[in-house]
């Protein structure tokens, strides 16, 4: 019984790690491409299509600050995702929200699996 649990936990952890590494490699390249490329609708649309997201609204906000400061221009993009509905995404972090959730879930499952293994083998 302990051997079966050990084998099962190793399989689950290896699948989680490989899936998380795969997701992070894609997100890093997309985020890097966004940082290196001028922000325009074309890049954002290509990224949205590659992430299976539909651009719902493109809103550009210009904020005038104090006379000693420059104007601040912020691009806020609203994506419609089948998983999360319509939500704003900062252009620097488009595509990394899902990988963050995946990483957190992987860490939680990793701790749970090894906590159970420790309990089983410490008896």
From Swiss-Prot:
<keyword id="KW-1133">Transmembrane helix</keyword>
<comment type="similarity">
    <text>Belongs to the RxLR effector family.</text>
</comment>
<dbReference type="GO" id="GO:0044167">
    <property type="term" value="C:host cell endoplasmic reticulum membrane"/>
</dbReference>
<keyword id="KW-0843">Virulence</keyword>
<dbReference type="GO" id="GO:0005576">
    <property type="term" value="C:extracellular region"/>
</dbReference>
<dbReference type="GO" id="GO:0016020">
    <property type="term" value="C:membrane"/>
</dbReference>
<keyword id="KW-0472">Membrane</keyword>
<keyword id="KW-0732">Signal</keyword>
<keyword id="KW-1038">Host endoplasmic reticulum</keyword>
<feature type="short sequence motif" description="RxLR-dEER">
    <location>
        <begin position="32"/>
        <end position="65"/>
    </location>
</feature>
<keyword id="KW-0964">Secreted</keyword>
<feature type="transmembrane region" description="Helical">
    <location>
        <begin position="101"/>
        <end position="121"/>
    </location>
</feature>
<comment type="function">
    <text>Secreted effector that does not suppress pattern-triggered immunity (PTI) in plant host.</text>
</comment>
<keyword id="KW-0812">Transmembrane</keyword>
<keyword id="KW-1043">Host membrane</keyword>
<protein>
    <recommendedName>
        <fullName>Secreted RxLR effector protein RXLR-C21</fullName>
    </recommendedName>
</protein>
<feature type="signal peptide">
    <location>
        <begin position="1"/>
        <end position="23"/>
    </location>
</feature>
